[in-house]
Amino acid sequence: MAMRSGRHPSLLLLLVLLLWLLQVSIIDSVQQETDDLTKQTKEKIYQPLRRSKRRWVITTLELEEEDPGPFPKLIGELFNNMSYNMSLMYLISGPGVDEYPEIGLFSLEDHENGRIYVHRPVDREMTPSFTVYFDVVERSTGKIVDTSLIFNIRISDVNDHAPQFPEKEFNITVQENQSAGQPIFQMLAVDLDEENTPNSQVLYFLISQTPLLKESGFRVDRLSGEIRLSGCLDYETAPQFTLLIRARDCGEPSLSSTTTVHVDVQEGNNHRPAFTQENYKVQIPEGRASQGVLRLLVQDRDSPFTSAWRAKFNILHGNEEGHFDISTDPETNEGILNVIKPLDYETRPAQSLIIVVENEERLVFCERGKLQPPRKAAASATVSVQVTDANDPPAFHPQSFIVNKEEGARPGTLLGTFNAMDPDSQIRYELVHDPANWVSVDKNSGVVITVEPIDRESPHVNNSFYVIIIHAVDDGFPPQTATGTLMLFLSDINDNVPTLRPRSRYMEVCESAVHEPLHIEAEDPDLEPFSDPFTFELDNTWGNAEDTWKLGRNWGQSVELLTLRSLPRGNYLVPLFIGDKQGLSQKQTVHVRICPCASGLTCVELADAEVGLHVGALFPVCAAFVALAVALLFLLRCYFVLEPKRHGCSVSNDEGHQTLVMYNAESKGTSAQTWSDVEGQRPALLICTAAAGPTQGVKDLEEVPPSAASQSAQARCALGSWGYGKPFEPRSVKNIHSTPAYPDATMHRQLLAPVEGRMAETLNQKLHVANVLEDDPGYLPHVYSEEGECGGAPSLSSLASLEQELQPDLLDSLGSKATPFEEIYSESGVPS
């Protein structure tokens, strides 16, 4: 026991000593590490950076495309040297692990070691590589203890794709005259394997050609894939070829694919056109152009209606003067010879044409596998032309000429001479165009002279030129004609006076614009200096024009017309003298109508005014007929009403004063004039009046004073009808102051003679005025104010009283209808 207890203190002492040594060692170690850290920090400051030792260790990760397995398959292993000091856990993430594409493709066996596995085959063409992240964490804390490792897993390529053409079949067209060695088509195949590797390198091969011809073939460039022509193509031999092309890669094992190319040969011009006949003869009449005088047939073995078949003709020799032209018939391919310029038998009765033919497309030939230009000249034919004689037309020398003459030349003035020649026959001249009939031509000599005065202002003159056309006609069969033209230039003279323009002759002015100036325009067909500027002057010798009108500003061709006072509605004449630049003038009249305007711009009642012109012209005629009808009615009344054997009264034989009486009473009002007033006005001529009962419009005689009644009784006498000389008795008047009428029948003719003479004179004057107005061609229409419609005068045949014997007392009971006539006759002293 004592020994055991003695050992224990020594053990404890040894243990304490060890702990002290460990503490000192730890302190020294910490101090050393601190010093080292400080030293390293200083070295980092004062020394360049150095690469630290890698703590990640990873084997090469390689994965072959389309690896058959078995799966899962180990592809690599990870290691981190920090696993010596602590317990670590490895993590993997990224595309192929937990991200697209290919989720779940890679994984770790467990998290304690870094073995990496793949779980299925990989298509490199889909995903050529994967970028994955590796991390290491402390198992106890889950804290990442080192920097993440980023690793790119590359998928190695295998030759698993063959080259592919974009189409299974190709259709191309090649010209027959395609030059050998030139590429005609480019083949291209695509290999999806890794680029710039043998797996994606493509080579091209021509496997077969159908048909296989020795002189016509194709070849393919192995690297570029261009198809080239070897030799010459012949459309007639092989119009189409079929080529089988293969594309192969250089991988192990190599893969390939094929495609078919159909080559259509488009025919070229490799056959020369040839005339079916080498010599032609044709007869052509002289003096006229002709179409299709000859057709030349050619043969061509190329395909019809192509540019290699269509013929193109050309006149190589004999057409130096341009008489001929040749074209091609598009349907038959024939050459059509035309005469476009008339031939002349006298100049060249015969000639020869050399015509050549070629195609629209260039002609080529194949020799020794190469295209060569033609060595022979184009095919030709000879056409012998025989010109037949015909009647040549005359020819003018010169065909047209200009003659300058002053207008107003007298008849017989020589204008010029036409000269025509015809080697075959005689010539006569005919005038065919002379619209104004101013000239004549001598049929033998062609001399043109005037037969009428010529006027530059004629409508047949255009820009001072008057055209005269002459024909020269020969006496051949059939007759031929030539045309010559004389251009007559007329110099102007001052032979026209200025005149008013049509729109300035008759002008309308609204009442509201009567003080605004009117623009009066004039014109003169003469040229400078015989025309404008014009001078305008008012004719002050005519009426009161200077008191009403005034001329304003002169514009050369027009002048302002101003009014000096207000004018009522109506028609006015404004006389003007208008002179040209040389002083030649003439009096002109402007007709101005002042009228109302509803809109302020245009006169109204235009239609009524036009009708008024005709009514005004017919008014004197109508008045004459009305006066005649009234006179006849009056005579009929006197004849049938008055009794021939009534008492007469002595009447003075004086004619009396010819005082005008106003017959404008249009109503049935009562007259305010007494018999004494009438008697005072016309004392020398007493005309009887009678009333059948109470007469409207005339006072009863009972209301008249005795003196006036006696005078009135003397004025009532018995008169026969006009010109009949039959006496009549006045009707009884109910008045105590009335006296019997004079029974002398010879008084009738004495009283009617002056009245009948005045009536005949008046009718003759009216008829004369009507005839003058009707026959006067220089009458200018006037506008009159509206006076109503003119009543038509009834014809004599419409008066029934002339056709039968009427009772003497027929007119005694007319009543109020005859009152206006009785008033008029009683006021004027005419017997009723």
Swiss-Prot record:
Q: Which GO terms describe its biological process?
A: adherens junction organization; calcium-dependent cell-cell adhesion via plasma membrane cell adhesion molecules; CD4-positive, alpha-beta T cell activation; cell migration; cell morphogenesis; cell-cell adhesion mediated by cadherin; cell-cell junction assembly; homophilic cell adhesion via plasma membrane adhesion molecules
Q: In which tissues is it expressed?
A: Expressed by epithelial cells of gastrointestinal tissue.
The residues the entry assigns to the signal sequence are 1-27
Residues passing through the membrane, by range:
615-635
Q: Where in the cell is it found?
A: Cell membrane
Task: Region Disordered: list its residue ranges.
Answer: 813-832
Gene3D superfamilies the UniProt entry points to: Cadherins
| Major subcellular site | membrane
Keyword line: Calcium, Cell adhesion, Cell membrane, Glycoprotein, Membrane, Metal-binding, Repeat, Signal, Transmembrane, Transmembrane helix
Judging by the UniProt lineage, the source's domain of life is Eukaryota
CDD domains, per database record:
Cadherin_repeat
- What does the record note on quaternary structure? Homodimer. Component of a cadherin:catenin adhesion complex composed of at least of CDH26, beta-catenin/CTNNB1, alpha-catenin/CTNNA1 and p120 catenin/CTNND1.
What the record says about its domains?
Answer: Three calcium ions are usually bound at the interface of each cadherin domain and rigidify the connections, imparting a strong curvature to the full-length ectodomain.
- State the name under which the record lists this protein: Cadherin-like protein 26
